Amino acid sequence: HPGSLISDYGGPEAAPVTLETMRILFSRESPSENSQFFSLQMTADGSPGKEVKISNFPHPHPDLKELPKEIIKYKRDDGVELNGTLYTPPGYDAARDGPLPLLMWAYPREFKTKEAASQLRDSPYRFTGIGPSSALVWLARGYAVLDGPALPIIGEGEGVEPNDTYVEQLVAGARAAVNEVVARGVADPERIAVGGHSYGAFMAANLLAHAPDLFACAIARSGAYNRTLTPFGFQAEERTLWEAPETYNAMSPFMNAHKIKKPILLIHGEEDQNSGTHLMQSERFFSALKGNGAEVKLVILPHESHGYRAKESINHMLAETSDWLDAHCAPGAKKAAEARAEEAAKAKRDAEEMVSK
C-alpha cells in the first residue's frame, strides 16, 4: 500500500529518504522467549534485507521458561462473555496430576456495554514476564494461577450506574471463573485463594463477604475497604457519597465485616500516598474483622507507599503470602481452618460468659 516516509533530518543539503537507506528497529518476543531487539536493512525494491539481532538479554526466570499458558473463555450466568489467562506449573498434566491449589488474581473494571466488557485484553503470544510482586511467582510453588480474569461491572442504558449492582456482578463473574477452572480439572474447589492489589484488594474482601463458598482465603494488598472514606468518588464512580449512600455502603467490605468468615491477609505500605488507600483503611478493617471473630492478619511495610519497592519489603510480602497460602490452601487446610474457627468461637463464647457473670 502507498505510504509516506517522514524524517526529522531536513535542510537544503539533506539527502532524500530512500528505501535502501532505511533501517528498521523492532522487537520480537514469544510466550517463552523475552523480548529482543533486531535491526532490519531495507532494499531498493522494498523487500526486507538482512536481519541482525542487536540485543541478547538473558531470560529473567529460566526455571519457569516453559509455562503452560492458555487464555480461557467462559460465560457469566447472564450470558456476558468473559476471559482470563490460566497458568499451570511447568510439566503439569491435569489427567495425571489432578487438581491443584489455585490463586485467582484480579482487578474489576466498569463498563457501559456488554460488548466492551467482553473484549479480549491479552494475547496468547505475549511473553510471560514475572515480576517480584506478580501472582505468577506462585507457579514455582506448585500453584495454578488464574491471572486477570475479567470481572466486569456493567451499567447499560440511560441513567444506569454500574456500581449499583457491583456486588451481584462481582460474585457472578467470580463464580463463573471458579466454575470454569474446576470443570477443567485444574483447580481443587476447596483450595482456591483470591487476591488483588488496591481495587483488587477491595474486590477480594468483597468476595469473602458475599461469596464465602468460592474461596478458602484471600490476600488483600493496599486496599480501601470503607467507601465512606472516599466520599467524592472512586475508580469510575462519579457520584458522591451523599448522592449514592446505599451504593457506597453496599460496596464497602467494612460494612460487611461481620459476614467475613474465611481467613484474609491484609498488607499495606505504612506511607501509602494514594488518595483513596491510606493505611487507616487496612487498620480500621483489621479491627472490624478481629472484633467480629474473623481470622485476619495485618502486615504493615515501613517506609512503603502504594506499591512496594524495597527488597526487604518485597521479600517480607512474599514470605507472608507464602505462609498464608500454605496454611489455607495446602492439603488438609480446610479441616485445620474449621478447627481454628471452632476454637476461636469457643473462646469468644467463654469470654462473653465471663463478662455476663
Residue ranges and their predicted role:
Residues 1-95, 133-136, 140:
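Non-catalytic accessory segments flanking enzyme active sites
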Residues 29, 105-109, 198-201, 269:
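Glycine-rich His-Gly loop
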Residues 34, 97-99, 189, 293:
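Short secondary-structure junction motifs
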Residues 68-70, 80, 100, 188, ...:
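Exposed loop/turn and edge beta-strand positions of beta-sandwich/beta-sheet ligand-binding modules
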Residues 88, 96-110:
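Short beta-strand element of the alpha/beta-hydrolase
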Residues 92-94, 112, 273-274:
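Short beta-strands and strand-coil junctions in structured, solvent-facing domains, enriched
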Residues 110-112, 145:
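Serine-hydrolase catalytic-loop signature spanning alpha/beta hydrolases and amidase-signature enzymes
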Residues 119-357:
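Active-site-proximal cap/loop segments of hydrolase catalytic domains
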